[in-house]
């Protein structure tokens, strides 16, 4: 493939989110694994303050070092995306300094590796839609619905997908007696629109509930309280090929999710330590494996997803129960989404090629 035939991919990462650093780590892995014979990569960072800046030129800057997590630095040169002159590609132009107005880069495809608020919730997808940009992944509606645990469950139930009981709080700090009876103990208290297990608490006693609600509400004014579902946690990736066909990965079973200090599959276990391991493919019987894969695809379709998703379940004695969906799953070197497809013989580079090749205007 000649240089003229290669696609230029803008990998956008960071963002105004509690998952800023996770996004940076994901972006570094993606940049390292995009096929250089097919793609020219342009890193674009978004700082915690919301400034768009030229991204890291060395992906070593996007890796965790012990417990020190990477962030997007602001060196004063700001850029912004805009519709390209030809109406096809997306331009990133300087808006500050001596080069204000000059083109920093022109991208054929945008890969928004953004997790959490202002990136995975439909907001940046709306911006790219207004620009007419081709981008990897889900559009506005699927991103917004998938980010909100309340609406994910409502849509899933309407589609006949099993879910556990939950109560949603808007400003309240207590549950009614009926709600406590419905949920039982323990419960998990979560920001309704958050990810990477940030702001989540496991509550074993009702006296600890107000503090857990306060913690979750510090991340999102809408709080969801979910009953504990008994059974192993499994994850399943969904990948949309360029021709529109959907592929469900071999599921992964997580082990040791209750071994850490948090008592559940929390942020540290996901990104900073080795208390949790995964078995891929999950040690499930053939019927349960097929059911997990079927429900993953059904959830993907119910939310109107495009490109990719990771769908998480608990496997109970009665069958799989939906936990949540991630419309832009982690792409760190240890993230489950690429690992599940790798176990099926799809390399990280081939996975990224499929995603970029299938990028579309929504």
Swiss-Prot record:
Keyword Cell wall biogenesis/degradation listed: yes
Binding site for ATP: 180-235
Binding note for cofactor: Binds 2 magnesium or manganese ions per subunit.
Domain of life: Bacteria
Record Gene3D superfamilies: 3.40.50.20, ATP-grasp fold, A domain (3.30.1490.20), ATP-grasp fold, B domain (3.30.470.20)
GO molecular function, one term: metal ion binding
Catalyzed reaction equations: 2 D-alanine + ATP = D-alanyl-D-alanine + ADP + phosphate + H(+)
UniProt xrefs under InterPro entries: ATP-grasp (IPR011761), ATP_grasp_subdomain_1 (IPR013815), D-Ala_lig_Van_CS (IPR000291), D_ala_D_ala (IPR005905), Dala_Dala_lig_C (IPR011095), Dala_Dala_lig_N (IPR011127), PreATP-grasp_dom_sf (IPR016185)
Pfam families, sorted: Dala_Dala_lig_C, Dala_Dala_lig_N
Annotated localization: Cytoplasm
Residues where Mg(2+) 2 binds: 324, 326
Enzyme Commission number(s): 6.3.2.4
Domain (ATP-grasp): residue spans on this chain: 153-357
Needed co-factor(s): Mg(2+); Mn(2+)
PROSITE patterns: ATP_GRASP, DALA_DALA_LIGASE_1, DALA_DALA_LIGASE_2
Biological pathway: Cell wall biogenesis; peptidoglycan biosynthesis
Gene Ontology BP terms: cell wall organization; peptidoglycan biosynthetic process; regulation of cell shape
Record family assignment: Belongs to the D-alanine--D-alanine ligase family.
Functional description taken from the UniProt entry: Cell wall formation.
Listed name of the protein: D-alanine--D-alanine ligase
This protein's encoding gene: ddl
């Amino acid at each position: 493939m000649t240089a003229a035939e290669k696609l230029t991919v803008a990998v956008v990462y960071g963002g105004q989110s509690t998952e800023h650093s996770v996004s940076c780590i994901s972006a570094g892995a993606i940049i390292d694994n995009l096929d250089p014979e097919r793609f020219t990569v342009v890193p674009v960072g978004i700082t915690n303050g919301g400034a768009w800046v030229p991204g890291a030129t060395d992906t070593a800057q996007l890796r965790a070092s012990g417990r020190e997590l990477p962030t997007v630095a602001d060196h004063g040169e700001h850029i912004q995306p805009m519709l390209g002159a030809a109406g096809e590609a997306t331009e990133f132009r300087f808006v500050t300094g001596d080069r204000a107005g000059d083109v920093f880069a022109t991208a054929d495809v945008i890969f928004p590796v953004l997790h959490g608020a202002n990136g995975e919730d439909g907001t940046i997808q709306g911006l790219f839609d207004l620009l007419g940009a081709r981008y990897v992944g889900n559009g506005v509606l699927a991103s917004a619905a998938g980010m909100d645990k309340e609406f994910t469950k409502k849509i899933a139930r309407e589609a006949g997908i099993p879910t556990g009981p939950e109560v949603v709080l808007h400003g309240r700090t207590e549950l009614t007696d009926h709600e406590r009876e419905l949920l039982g103990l323990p419960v998990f208290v979560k920001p309704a629109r958050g990810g990477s297990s940030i702001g989540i608490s496991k509550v074993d006693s009702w006296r600890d509930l107000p503090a857990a609600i306060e913690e979750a509400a510090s991340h999102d004014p809408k709080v969801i309280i979910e009953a504990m579902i008994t059974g192993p946690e499994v994850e399943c990736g969904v990948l949309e090929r360029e021709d529109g066909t959907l592929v469900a990965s071999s599921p992964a079973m997580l082990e040791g999710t209750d071994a850490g200090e948090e008592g559940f599959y929390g942020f540290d276990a996901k990104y900073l330590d080795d208390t949790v391991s995964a078995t891929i493919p999950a040690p499930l019987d053939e019927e349960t494996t097929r059911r997990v894969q079927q429900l993953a695809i059904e959830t993907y379709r119910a939310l109107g997803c495009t490109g990719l998703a990771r769908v998480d379940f608990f496997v109970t004695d009665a069958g799989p129960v939906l936990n949540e969906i991630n419309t832009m799953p982690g792409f760190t070197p240890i993230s489950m989404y690429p690992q599940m497809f790798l176990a099926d013989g799809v390399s990280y580079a081939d996975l990224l090629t499929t995603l970029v090749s299938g990028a579309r205007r929504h």
